[in-house]
Amino acid sequence: MDADRLAELQLTRAEMRRIGEALQDRRFRELLTEYVEEISSPENRRRYEEEIRRLEEERGAAVQFIHPTPHHVLKGRGPSGKCFINICSDQLIEKPRSEAATDDRGRSGHSWRIPYSLTPGRAGRDAAGAPCVLFDAVFHPDALLMAENNARFMTLIHRTATGGIQDNFRIRLEHVTRLKMMKYKGEPQPTMIRRPNPGQTEAADRGPQQTTGPQQPTGPQQPTDPQQPTDTQQPTDPQQTTGPQQTTGPQQTTGPHQPTDPQQTTGPQQPTDPQQPTGPHQPTDPQQTTDPPPTAPQYRLKYRSVLDLQDYRCCRDSGSAGRPTAIIIEVEVPRLRSAQEAELRVEERRLLLEAPTAEYRLELPLAYPVEEERAEAQFNHTHRLLTVTLPVLKRRRVEEEERRAEEEESRKGGDEDGELHPDCGPDPPMMELQTEDTHTPAADTHTPAADTHTPAADTHTPAAETGAGLGSGVALLSSSNVISVCGADVHQQLEEPGDPSAHTDPADTHPADTDPADTDPAHTDPADTDPADTDPAHTDPAHTDPEMESRIAGLHLQNTLCFQLD
């Protein structure tokens, strides 16, 4: 252990050699021994404390030295390693006091006020020689006496000591336990408590400002200050010398000049505030001290998931294993006394924690939507840790998504089926096609009035009439691409000859009856129309060309097959 302490000094070879040579000198050893006895002597320590006390009193502060009496030790773990808290007592600490009070539930009890003193952490070593940190918490002896007889009061003493160290030194202590076989860790050291002196102020006792106060010769001329000397005092205001001079006035001229001091302070301050730049800066200082901005506490974010083998199936309805079931947030709030001092708001995508008394504010966005109604919060008084558990909303079921997708597909499909061909109407059934294309004898029968006894007009080919009839039937079935193609084939087959004379029956054509004059509609005389001259071959339904009937039957069969295949 001594070798480790020597290594911490980081001495060079030259320094080690010089120390070795000095220790060989007898005179050096005598001086070193005398110095050790001097600093360890109680009388010298008392003299040293008295000198420090006088020096602080001259500066306007009352100093008290506390010599802690060991009682027991608490052991914990901090951010840098082991920590030991020495619970001590001293008569200079105030006694604990209690007052009758009621809690939020209306239960009556006592509210305790326990004064204590803390020392900053100092380096030390544990039993194994590892580095550690030592703290001292000093209470009044009556407080420790009550704690020995009451376990709840002892717990209150421990919480007060650990909470004060965490709040004042900004560290976190974990796993704090009591060591029963140890009263003090390390070497007891006196503690100095410095309080302001009631008779003086610290601002008036500063070095360069103490000399300016007594040197002013304006003491007896103070009643005339509000009229003339205000002009001479204004240039001294930017030098920040009027602040301590005004405070030293009532301290030095206590008796007769007290009624004139308020006039001096209120007189020059009111006209100089709007003129000099020192005025607007004065109200900003108390705002900065009274309203400090809240700090964001440290937190840890965790995601909790429940392992389920159903989530790993090769199915579309299996859940996603990467989505957590809950979000856990651990917030460190060492300055928070109880959970009632904090306000927690949970939204679907945001968490907000506000503690005005402890000056905490934390706004945290959430990666997953959570259920606000099922949120839980738990506060650990020992570790000053706030744990918030937020259940994550489950993902939408796959069945609902599939149903919605099917509805959208069916809606789109209905829109596409509703679009009709510009040349076609709605799709008729197959029976309507057969009845439409079936040529009755009455449809092909030419009335005598329409024949007008002209041989040229009698040359109406059955193919042209049949093509017109089939064209209308095909147009009714052109609701799809296949039927439209079939309809185009029908028209192409009907229009292939291109020469109307090719379908003219030689038996129906009379060359002798052909007259160029008769072919002109303008020269047609109604009187020339004779019912007896009507060709009986045109009015006979049985008089039909066999070749055209076979072609019409083939076209009917082709249209029927195209409709059934579609």
From Swiss-Prot:
Keywords for the protein's UniProt record, in alphabetical order: Cytoplasm
Biased composition (Low complexity): 208-290, 440-467
Disordered: annotated segments: 183-298, 399-467, 493-552
Gene Ontology cellular-component terms listed: cytoplasm; dynein axonemal particle; extracellular region
Intracellular or extracellular location(s): Cytoplasm; Dynein axonemal particle
Biological process per Gene Ontology, one example term: epithelial cilium movement involved in extracellular fluid movement
Record-linked InterPro entries: Kintoun, PIH1/Kintoun_subfamily, PIH1_N, PIH1D1/2/3_CS-like
One Pfam match: PIH1_CS
Compositionally skewed regions (Basic and acidic residues) per UniProt: 399-424, 535-550
Cytoplasm in keyword set: yes
Keyword Repeat listed: no
Major localization class: cytoplasm
Record function comment: Required for cytoplasmic pre-assembly of axonemal dyneins, thereby playing a central role in motility in cilia and flagella. Involved in pre-assembly of dynein arm complexes in the cytoplasm before intraflagellar transport loads them for the ciliary compartment.
Family from the record: Belongs to the PIH1 family. Kintoun subfamily.
Name of protein: Protein kintoun
